Amino acid sequence: MNVLKEVYSTIEKRIQEKPEGSYVVKLTTDDKKTAVNKICEKIGEEAAEVIIAAKDDDKAEIIYESADLIFHTMVLLAKSGITYEELSEEFKKRMK
C-alpha cells in the first residue's frame, strides 16, 4: 500500500472509530461546519508555512510543511466523505 493511501485510511478509521487522544478526532468531532472551519484554518496556516519555506528556499522545511498541508487536506477530504479512490480518479482524469 502506498504511504499516502495508508495515511488516508488511518484518517478515515480515526474519524469513524474516534479513539481517545487522536489529533484527527480533535479536529473532526465538532458539528460538521465547526470541524470544517477548524480544518480549513489549519490548511491556511500550513499553506502559509509552505510559502514561507519556499521563499526561504529551505528544502527540508518545504518538505516538512508540505506534509502538514497534505495531511490536513486529507483530513478535510475524509471529513467531507471523499474517498481516496475518488481523489485518485480525479487525478487520473487530469493525466489525459
UniProtKB/Swiss-Prot annotation:
One of its GO terms (biological process) is L-histidine biosynthetic process. Its EC number is 3.6.1.31. Signal peptide: none annotated. Pfam families: PRA-PH. InterPro entries: HisE (IPR008179), PRib-ATP_PPHydrolase-like (IPR021130). One of its GO terms (molecular function) is ATP binding. It catalyses: 1-(5-phospho-beta-D-ribosyl)-ATP + H2O = 1-(5-phospho-beta-D-ribosyl)-5'-AMP + diphosphate + H(+). It is found in: Cytoplasm. PANTHER family: HISTIDINE BIOSYNTHESIS BIFUNCTIONAL PROTEIN, HISTIDINE BIOSYNTHESIS BIFUNCTIONAL PROTEIN HIS7. This is Phosphoribosyl-ATP pyrophosphatase.
